[in-house]
C-alpha cells in the first residue's frame, strides 16, 4: 500500500513555513503546544458562534501564533474578514478578552490581528467549509465538488484535487470519491501545495473531505 504523508509536514522548511513560532524548554514544550491549541479552538469557537447566523462560513484560512517572553501575537488570516470587522473594535476586543480568559495569561500581553486574503477560494480550509455547507444542504457531492473546482480556477491555481469519503448520499456502504483538475505533484518537494482535511457531520453520518491545491512551483 502507498504510504501517504501529510503534504504540509513533508514540505516544512522548503516551501512551507511553521504556523507557530516560539521556543520552549523541552519540559515546558507540551504546555506551549496546549496553549496554541486553546488559542486556535477559542478563536474558531468564537467565530462559529457569531458568524454562523449570517453566512454559515467561518472563512479562516489559518491562524499564526508568535510568542515572546511578554507578548503573544496572533494573526488570523481570513477570507471574509468583514464578518469580524463589521463593528471591528468591539468584536476583536471581545475575542481578545475570551482568549485571555481561556489562557489565564497574567504577565503577558495578547495581541490579535486580522489579515485579509485576496483569493479566499484559493485556500483549502475555506473551500472545505464551502463543500461542507453544500453537503449539509443535501446538494449532490459531484455538484459540490465541481462548484468548488470552478471557484478555485478563478483564484489562478495550477491544480486541485478534492476527495470525499464516507456514506456519500446516505448509501449503506461507505466509499471514497475524488476528482482532480490540473496538476497536483505530491511527490515534488519544490511544488508548493496547500492541504487540509475537514470533517463534516451530515444527517447521514460523518464525511471526511480532503483538499490538495497546487499553488505554484518555487
From Swiss-Prot:
It holds the Pfam family Ribosomal_S3_C. Its main location: plastid. Residues 47-118 form the KH type-2 domain. GO terms for molecular function: rRNA binding; structural constituent of ribosome. It is found in: Plastid, Chloroplast. GO terms for cellular component: chloroplast; cytosolic small ribosomal subunit. Gene3D superfamilies: 3.30.300.20, Ribosomal protein S3, C-terminal domain (3.30.1140.32). SUPFAM superfamilies: Prokaryotic type KH domain (KH-domain type II), Ribosomal protein S3 C-terminal domain. One of its GO terms (biological process) is translation. CDD domains: KH-II_30S_S3. The keyword RNA-binding applies. Keywords: Chloroplast, Plastid, Ribonucleoprotein, Ribosomal protein, RNA-binding, rRNA-binding. Part of the 30S ribosomal subunit. Belongs to the universal ribosomal protein uS3 family. This is Small ribosomal subunit protein uS3c.
